[in-house]
Amino acid sequence: MDRYLGLARRDARRLFKLPKTERVRLVATHGRSISGICEYTRDYQSTVKLNVDLRWTWPALRDMAAHEAYPGHHVHQATREWEYLHGDFPREAAVSLAACPMGPVEEGIGENAMWFLRWDRTPEDRMTLALNRLRWGTEVNLAFMVHRDEPRRELLRYAMHSGLVDWKQAVRDVRYARNRTWASYAFCYWYGTAIIRNQFLKMDGDPALFDVLYWRPHTVRTLAAAFRRL
């Protein structure tokens, strides 16, 4: 994971002029329900926590490095702090909240981070990106199934069949869907990814896209309006 963080940082710096002092610290965690998380503090510093109780493939670690750090959540938060301190960001734009109108933008950036780096060229990376889409589509459907009070055994069966995961991962996915806060957040991943990826492919990686995504605060509606002006 350290190696992929370094490679992602190198490639992200070709896209963004980042503060020289920005850093990411990698910490191993155990027994957490999450697979990984970026905890941004201040002064362009983040801690990326990785659940080492899970089984990881090297393409999944590449995706995690890009999603949580470069050019995903860490870079997004660092640019927002810079704009707050030196630009014209309002104070509330520097705050990150789960399951709010900014959520699809934040997770859409994270889920497309490998695309931004052009880390979508090998069969392994393309498979990882496809599995990510499958996972969040499955989570959205699981959230609807929970809302309909479908039995847990049906949730687990669907999670395994649709998400192509084993029993242990299906249990984690169902637990996620039964948490009301996180169930709503699944939609941020699914729809945020689609909105941003469609624009990225349309613009073929034009830097103007990154100016909109990273250097301006957006909700889904303001982002859609900004995309129409590009």
What are the language-model segments listed below?
Residues D2-R3, R55, A65, C100-P104, ...:
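Soluble non-cytosolic domains of exported or imported proteins
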Residues M1, A60, A94-P101, T128-L129, ...:
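Second-shell loop/turn segments in exported
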Residues M1-Q45:
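Contiguous, non-catalytic segments that form substrate-binding/exosite surfaces or channel walls
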Residues Q77-D125:
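Post-HExxH zinc-binding segment in Zn-dependent metallohydrolases
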Residues K49-A66:
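Short pre-active-site segment immediately N-terminal to the catalytic Zn-binding motif
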Residues M64, E68-Q77, G108:
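Catalytic glutamate of the conserved HExxH
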Residues E107, E111-R180:
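Long, amphipathic alpha-helical stalk/connector segments used for oligomerization, subunit docking
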Residues W167-L230:
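C-terminal, non-catalytic "cap/extension" segments appended to globular domains
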